């Protein structure tokens, strides 16, 4: 392959998105459109990657540089100060290349999220094989409104491209359209750009006019037709963004299915492009797997589960759970109605049950937190059991502190752990205990006082009530000790 450079056009205003977010930074399948574009071109053996920015450059340029760093590729930024058309944008992009660059220049857009490395590689190979001045991708649309139409000779040769605003009625009837993805000989491109004129309905310098100029100069001009129109579809508004997101999601889902994952209802399952799932895992309806989520084999996920940047081990079950930046060990069970906040790490064969919330907590192998519990800023050892309705009280209004629970600990229901506090290995707590001091290994912690039964209280304080009648029918008396007559005895 000849030396290659890639120019990504990302300077458009994106007004039809009606958004404060730059168009190319809108996301689908867990990546911005610009990220999709850079991932596609990063797979090419291109010497130079250039992103042309204009409006919102203070947000788009740093994003491009960060994505490039993630991909291990240097990205050069070129600035289009004035919006004078696509031809002018490419001119700006060429300023970021060495003046003596003579290879192939690939031009694509930052709002074509499904374009892939394979399609671009084929374009470059076809272009180089014919020593062409210009090679462009085309596709056929049932409704070509808004796209440039491909003009051909009777024998099929490409004459040029006419934009929608400049097309005649007969030209608008053409359904083969320009995909706005090109490969150019650098010399031919520079020469043609220097001769562009803004004598058109938009008053802009059209990159598409380069095709006709290159042909008139005697250069070879070729077109490669793409049957899969979604690969080269652009995004101008949120409707198109949602449409392409659905197409991409369906392809991602099918890829996992073909790799051995059972997805019960593809229509209600959304999976980001960077998610990995092991074989024989079952994904149930209403599930969203987002970000860099990684799921092992033989797991069960869902229904109605959202996991973002979560690692799930082999054989785990995660049911009706919302999790972010968490780790779930092999053969663990989570849910239903469990909330895993960042920093949660559940060991193998553990359990986080119904209405449990965890945050910044490490929970050891075989440990169970079965019901109605908040575990925040905590370390729990192995094979412990946390009773229902327990709370790890980690915040005093100013500082968050940690609680440490040992291994083989059993805590009663409604235990409150007031951090910072440590419960030693093998210790127990009674129901309703408020643990304010460290509990030694093997000890039983009990903070509640003895129970007092004030007999006859209902008959005296709620005479005539249904409760009093039921008590009387059960043989309850009205007498009570004198010391139990005061308001402190009755809670009144």
Swiss-Prot record:
The keyword Cell wall biogenesis/degradation applies. Residues 469-483 have a biased composition (Low complexity). Binds 1 Mg(2+) ion per subunit. The active site is at 371 (proton acceptor). Mg(2+) binds at residues 111, 236. Pathway: Nucleotide-sugar biosynthesis; UDP-N-acetyl-alpha-D-glucosamine biosynthesis; N-acetyl-alpha-D-glucosamine 1-phosphate from alpha-D-glucosamine 6-phosphate (route II): step 2/2; Nucleotide-sugar biosynthesis; UDP-N-acetyl-alpha-D-glucosamine biosynthesis; UDP-N-acetyl-alpha-D-glucosamine from N-acetyl-alpha-D-glucosamine 1-phosphate: step 1/1; Bacterial outer membrane biogenesis; LPS lipid A biosynthesis. Keywords: Acyltransferase, Cell shape, Cell wall biogenesis/degradation, Cytoplasm, Magnesium, Metal-binding, Multifunctional enzyme, Nucleotidyltransferase, Peptidoglycan synthesis, Repeat, Transferase. It is an enzyme of class 2 (transferase). Its cofactor is Mg(2+). Its EC number is 2.7.7.23, 2.3.1.157. One of its GO terms (biological process) is regulation of cell shape. GO terms for molecular function: glucosamine-1-phosphate N-acetyltransferase activity; magnesium ion binding; UDP-N-acetylglucosamine diphosphorylase activity. UDP-N-acetyl-alpha-D-glucosamine binds at residues 9-12, 23, 80, 85-86, 148, 163, 178, 236, 341, 359, 374, 385. Residues 260-492 are annotated as: N-acetyltransferase. It comes from the Bacteria. It is found in: Cytoplasm. Homotrimer. Catalyzes the last two sequential reactions in the de novo biosynthetic pathway for UDP-N-acetylglucosamine (UDP-GlcNAc). The C-terminal domain catalyzes the transfer of acetyl group from acetyl coenzyme A to glucosamine-1-phosphate (GlcN-1-P) to produce N-acetylglucosamine-1-phosphate (GlcNAc-1-P), which is converted into UDP-GlcNAc by the transfer of uridine 5-monophosphate (from uridine 5-triphosphate), a reaction catalyzed by the N-terminal domain. HAMAP family: GlmU. In the N-terminal section; belongs to the N-acetylglucosamine-1-phosphate uridyltransferase family. This is Bifunctional protein GlmU. The gene is glmU.
């Amino acid at each position: 392959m000849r030396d290659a450079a890639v120019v990504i056009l990302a300077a458009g205003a994106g007004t039809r998105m009606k958004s404060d977010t730059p168009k190319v930074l809108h996301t689908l399948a867990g990546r911005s459109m610009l990220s999709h574009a850079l991932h596609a071109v990063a797979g090419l053996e291109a010497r130079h990657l250039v992103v042309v920015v204009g409006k919102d450059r203070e947000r788009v340029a740093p994003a491009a540089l960060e994505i490039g760093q993630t991909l291990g590729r240097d990205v050069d930024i070129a600035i289009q100060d004035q919006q004078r058309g696509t031809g002018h944008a490419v001119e700006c992009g060429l300023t970021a290349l060495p003046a003596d660059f003579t290879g192939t220049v690939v031009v694509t857009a930052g709002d074509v999220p499904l374009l892939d490395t394979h399609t671009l590689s084929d374009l470059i190979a076809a272009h180089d094989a014919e020593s062409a001045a210009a090679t462009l991708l085309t596709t056929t649309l049932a409704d070509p409104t808004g796209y440039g139409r491909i003009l051909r000779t009777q024998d099929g040769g490409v004459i040029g491209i006419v934009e929608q605003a400049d097309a005649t009625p007969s030209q608008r009837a053409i359904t083969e359209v320009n995909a706005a993805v090109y490969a150019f000989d650098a010399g031919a491109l520079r020469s043609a750009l220097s001769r562009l004129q803004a004598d058109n309905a938009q008053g802009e310098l059209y990159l598409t006019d380069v095709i006709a100029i290159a042909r008139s100069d005697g250069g070879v001009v070729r077109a490669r037709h793409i049957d899969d129109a979604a690969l080269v579809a652009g995004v101008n508004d949120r409707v198109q963004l949602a449409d392409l997101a659905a197409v991409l999601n369906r392809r991602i889902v099918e890829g996992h299915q073909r790799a051995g994952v059972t997805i019960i209802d593809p229509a209600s399952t959304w999976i980001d492009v960077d998610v990995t799932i092991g074989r024989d895992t079952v994904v149930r309806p209403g599930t969203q797997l987002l970000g860099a989520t990684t799921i092992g084999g033989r797991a069960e996920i869902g229904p109605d589960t959202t996991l973002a940047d979560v690692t799930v081990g082999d054989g785990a079950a995660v049911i009706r759970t919302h999790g972010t930046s968490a780790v779930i060990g092999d053969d663990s069970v989570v849910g239903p109605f469990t909330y895993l906040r960042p920093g949660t790490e559940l060991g193998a064969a553990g359990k986080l049950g119904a209405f449990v919330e965890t945050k910044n907590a490490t929970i050891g192998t075989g440990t169970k937190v079965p019901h109605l519990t908040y575990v925040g800023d905590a370390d729990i050892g192995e094979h412990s059991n946390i009773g229902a309705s327990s709370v790890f009280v980690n915040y005093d209004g100013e500082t968050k502190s940690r609680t440490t629970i040992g291994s083989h600990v059993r805590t009663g229901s409604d235990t409150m752990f007031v951090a910072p506090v440590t419960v030693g290995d093998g210790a127990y707590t009674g129901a309703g205990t408020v643990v304010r001091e460290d509990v030694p290994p093997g000890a039983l912690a009990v903070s509640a006082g003895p129970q007092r039964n004030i007999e006859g209280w209902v008959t005296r304080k709620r005479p005539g009530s249904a409760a009093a009648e039921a008590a009387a029918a059960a043989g309850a008396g009205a007498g009570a000790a004198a010391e139990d007559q005061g308001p402190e005895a009755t809670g009144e």
